[in-house]
UniProtKB/Swiss-Prot annotation:
It holds the Pfam family DUF134. InterPro entries: UPF0251 (IPR002852), WH-like_DNA-bd_sf (IPR036388). This is UPF0251 protein MM_0989. Belongs to the UPF0251 family.
Length: 120
């Protein structure tokens, strides 16, 4: 068994969890597929940057981690999705180290929420 080295991974703040957590190539039986696992926080990194269009710095602040930690999540997510799509593997979204938070109605509300968390 591998020993964990370095600092423990801190939980990421996640605004959305997916309703659908499994994707597979059409026409291929599930029993014959290899599966790539994508964590909830990796999916959140993809959503914030690629769908919402946030800069990585802003997305990292929203998730509550450093830019480097956010970049590692985003890089891992993109690699896993590209691997699954290019090699015909299934994608399973599960697990991770995250805290589910409510979505702020406006950016101003989000800034206030982040400020309050920093003060605590």
């Amino acid at each position: 068994m591998k020993k964990c080295r370095g600092r423990p991974k801190c939980p990421r703040r996640v605004e959305q969890t997916p309703d659908i957590t499994y994707f597979k190539p059409r026409g291929v039986p599930l029993s014959g597929l290899e599966v790539v696992s994508l964590t909830i926080e990796e999916l959140e990194a993809l959503r914030l940057v690629d769908i919402e269009g946030l800069r990585q710095e802003d997305a990292a602040t929203r998730v509550g981690v450093s830019r480097r930690a956010f970049w590692e999540d985003l890089k891992a997510a993109r690699m896993k999705v590209a691997l699954a799509l290019s090699t015909g593997k299934a994608i399973e979204i599960k697990g991770g180290n995250y805290i589910r938070i409510e979505t702020a109605d406006t950016n101003e509300d989000a800034d206030k929420m982040l400020t309050r968390e920093k003060e605590i």
